[in-house]
Amino acid sequence: MSEKQNEKVYDLSFFMPGQTIEAEEVEVPISKRFVDKEGNVVPFIFKAITTERIDELEKENTTYKNVKGRGRVKELDSQRFYARIAVETTVYPNFKAKELREAYKTEDPVEVAKRVLSVGGEYANWLNKAIEINGFDDDLEDLEEAAKN
């Protein structure tokens, strides 16, 4: 039997442009402090972002430093990187919204998120959920370690 006959043929049509299912929005309660008029917890709405956008965020949060004996070293601000992923992933509340930035007196959407999610654990819950929705199943420590290497 020739090698060609043993080769298995795989259907690549599943991976062609236009064949993928778009990422869905996911509602998740992040804090019990945000309630509507009926007293129901207001969920945050998340939607995964593209790999290309994650790459852009990584570049925006990476600096290069000259280290004696090692040359130019790449350094990722992993906390800011993950926070930016979370801001981009959060559809509601939109931390980039002008009204929120003005209300919290900052132009930085990450700062807005920190001020909105000011009770211990809320900010971490929000970050973890955004990371999870983007397909990162590892915990943040593992991701930070991988990003450093």
Swiss-Prot record:
Record Pfam families: Phage_TAC_5 (PF08890)
Coiled coil regions, renumbered to chain: none
InterPro entries attached to this UniProt entry: XkdN-like, XkdN-like_sf
Similarity comment: To B.subtilis XkdN.
Protein name listed in UniProt: Uncharacterized protein YqbN
Originating organism: Bacillus subtilis (strain 168)
Originating gene: yqbN
